[in-house]
Regions:
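Conserved active-site and cofactor/substrate-binding residues in soluble primary-metabolism enzymes
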Residues: 37-41, 111, 115, 172, ...
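Internal, conserved structured core segments that host functional sites
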Residues: 99, 107-159, 181
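Catalytic cores of processing enzymes, dominated by hydrolases/peptidases
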Residues: 141-222, 226
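Hydrophobic/aromatic beta-strand patches that form the interior of the parallel beta-sheet core
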Residues: 56, 102-104, 133, 191-196
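A conserved C-terminal secondary-structure "cap"
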Residues: 203-342
Length: 342
């Protein structure tokens, strides 16, 4: 494997300000499994409501499969004017009280998963991150007219909030990079937890703000961060009104929703559909996702011009012996660990 540190550049001055903060890191991907576009909407919401600065930028050109996921291009009259830009960025964020946290967001890597996962894990270790949290939408046989159920999974069972319904047994599913990262974080002894917002399967391809808001509230609960809801309540109200109007136009859809409402109400004691039913729903959703090549653009972040384009292997890299090194000077083959918070 090539050196993971050559996958990114960073801001040395901003890196220094992270000493002693022991932040939470949120990773919200525009990726493989995200029913209701929960993760994407959360990332856009946080970037629009929280102060942020670009700390690390990954070289996504090494991670993206352009033929497998082709960029959208704009042609005007007689020339091309633009193409989708892919990015993966780690930003320093401030919540409503001024508390520092980190946000890793962008398109999930197509290539070099081991190398990218190792790079992110090493950054997490050097930044002395105390907890890694993700959120995404899970396609389920639930109605939009009932409260969004949240289920959790984590690298350690004692990280899981209670109650946490047992929503699935054991099954094999195609992996997304977020899940792959969580697995490797657990192997490295890093605490990581994911928030799964249950999204009606018939809304999996469109934004479902009720689930977005439920996921945000769950994140604030498990992290202690004060994250503003901003306009999410208004977006939820408008979104639900649009869904209700569409349902009212179709007798067939009304019957499906009514059936799901009955099932939901019968399961109010916490029991959920069987693993086979959930597995079938997930497999159907994942099959649909696999057949797509159209790219959904990631939430925009701070301009790349704000980053010090330091040579990742140069003297200013966190693992080199220069003044910007967040750990001790490297005296051997093993890169230094973080000092902050210790």
């Amino acid at each position: 494997m090539l050196d993971p540190r050559l996958l990114y550049s960073f801001s040395p001055a901003l890196w220094e300000t992270m000493r002693g903060t022991r932040p939470v890191l949120l990773h919200l991907w525009d990726g493989y499994i995200d029913a209701g576009l929960v993760s994407q909407a959360l990332a856009e919401h946080l970037l629009s409501t929280c102060r942020h600065e670009l700390l690390v930028e990954f070289d996504h050109d090494q991670l993206h499969d352009y033929r497998g996921r082709r960029p959208r291009m704009i042609f005007d009259t007689d020339h091309f004017v633009s193409a989708t830009q892919f990015s993966l960025r780690l930003l320093k964020m401030w919540d409503a009280t001024g508390k520092v946290f980190l946000l890793l967001t962008g398109r999930e890597p197509d290539l070099q998963w081991e190398r990218a996962s190792t790079a992110i894990t090493e950054l997490i270790q050097r930044l002395d991150v105390r907890l890694v949290v993700s959120a995404y939408g899970i396609p389920m046989g639930v109605p939009h007219s009932r409260p969004t159920m949240i289920t959790y999974h984590a690298t350690r069972s004692d990280l899981l909030p209670r109650p946490n319904p047992m929503w699935i047994g054991r099954m094999e599913v195609p992996g997304g990079f977020g899940s792959f990262l969580e697995l490797n974080l657990g192997k490295a002894g890093i605490d990581a937890l994911s928030v799964g917002a249950n999204v009606p399967h018939y809304l999996a391809e469109s934004r479902f703000y009720q689930a977005v808001l439920a996921a945000l509230e769950s994140i604030t609960t498990v992290t202690g961060l004060t994250l503003p809801a901003g306009g999410l309540y208004e977006a939820e109200t408008a979104n639900n009104a649009e869904i209700a109007a569409e349902v009212a136009d179709s007798t067939e859809v009304q019957q499906v929703v009514s059936m799901l409402e009955s099932q939901y109400d019968q399961q109010a004691d916490g029991d959920l559909p069987s693993a086979d039913e959930i597995g079938a729903e997930l497999e159907r959703f994942l099959h649909d996702e696999s057949s797509k090549q159209e790219y959904r653009g990631p939430a925009s972040a701070t301009s790349a011009d704000d980053v010090d384009r330091t040579d990742p292997g140069g003297a200013d890299h966190p693992d080199a012996g220069g003044d910007a090194d967040p750990g001790e000077p490297d005296t051997g083959d093993e890169p230094p660990g973080p000092e902050s918070g210790r």
